[in-house]
Structures are given as structure tokens and as C-alpha cells.
Amino acid sequence: MLPLSDGLRARRFPIVNVSIIVANFAVWLFYELPHLRHAVFEASFYPCTVNNSCSGPESWGVSWITAMFLHGSWDHILGNMLFLAVFGKNVEDAFGALRYLAFYFAGGFVATMTQTLATLAFGTAAEARVPNLGASGAIAAVLGAYFVLYPNSNVFGLIVIFPVRISAYFFLGAWFLYQLIEANFGLFGSAANGGGVAFFAHVGGFVFGAIVAWLLTGAGLVAPQDRSTAARAPAY
């Protein structure tokens, strides 16, 4: 299912979420220049650099950040940015701009390290040398936070060409279950990279996001809006 809208209106313009989306497209277009296409791999993250079993073009302490803004194809970036546009705005609305920015990068780091640990522990040496890139780990953290903050909101989307409406609880729950199943299949198949998809990054990011949202909500530091407030808020 492709999500198109969550039916919730943010109380404030989601400046951080929009800026992240713009930055991702800007970086994508930059690396699409003919003489720079090969350079995308130089800025990608390589799991083997963490345990020094290989030497990557960049230190892993830098490349985990740069890799979050890189994508391998148009469908890769469009899918990621669609999910971020639909779910990110209201997570930022609840967190506040600066906290959301820190959360996004922290989620990306946790997701990257989860994938790295799985690859180094269960994958082959060749898989540890496969470049990791994409924003999906950080976006998975956003989805996990949304799952906790807005479980009863309605997600409007498409299954193939058919419009559907489903609660966020079931949509994101099903999404997470799929990632979890695929990650476990990757384990038993000795393919921790999941056939080119970083499923462990998605699982790690989602769990991190859900835990952070739960803790911050319990501490009173995050204030998700209720549906009646959302209905009266300006549309963003």
C-alpha cells in the first residue's frame, strides 16, 4: 500500500521535515550529474569499516550521515520521501522542530548500526562490503514514533490502483511485521542485507522511534494533537 495522506493537519508548518525532503532531492539530483554518478558509492556507508575489515572511501563516523541522503534510483527516493511527507509532518508537530531534527538523525544512526551489527554477525564478508545508502532507516524511526503518537489516525492510500482507508495502527503494524519477517528470512538465508533491502535497519529504526516517542510522551515532553484539534488546524 502506498500512503497518500493521514488526514491530520499539522498545527505548524513542518519546516524540518520539508527541509529534509528538499535536501534529499537536491542531493539526488546532484549525484545524477553524469560525471558524479560513480561518486555516490564514495559517500555510502560500508558495514565492514566499523570493524576495520575493509577500508571505505570515508570514515564510518561520517558516512553514516552522508549515506542517509543518498538513493539508488528514482523509485527508491520517491518511495522514501512519500512516507516521510505523509508521516513526518505530524511527528515534527508533536516533537517540535529541533527535537525532531535530533530524533531523525539519531534514528538514522540506530538504524544503520542495527543493520551493521546484523550484517557483521550473520552476513558474509562480501555482504559487509556492500554499500548501504538511503533514508529509510531514519524514516522507519519516524514511522515508529507515529505508531505510538497517532495510532487511531486514518491512512489514505492506494493498493495497486484501488483507494483504501486504514488505521495507522494496522497500516504501520503490518509494515513493521513485514520488515521483521523479511529480516528473519535474511538471517536464515545468510543474507543479512535482505536482497538489497536493509530490513534490519527498518526494524531497528522503527523500534527506536516507538520507544523514544513512548518515553517522551510519558515524560510530558511530546504533545501529539487530538483529532478535534487537527480538524481545526491550518492545512500543511
Where are these regions (language model features)?
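A detector for small-residue-rich transmembrane helices and their helix-helix packing motifs
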Residues: M1-Y236
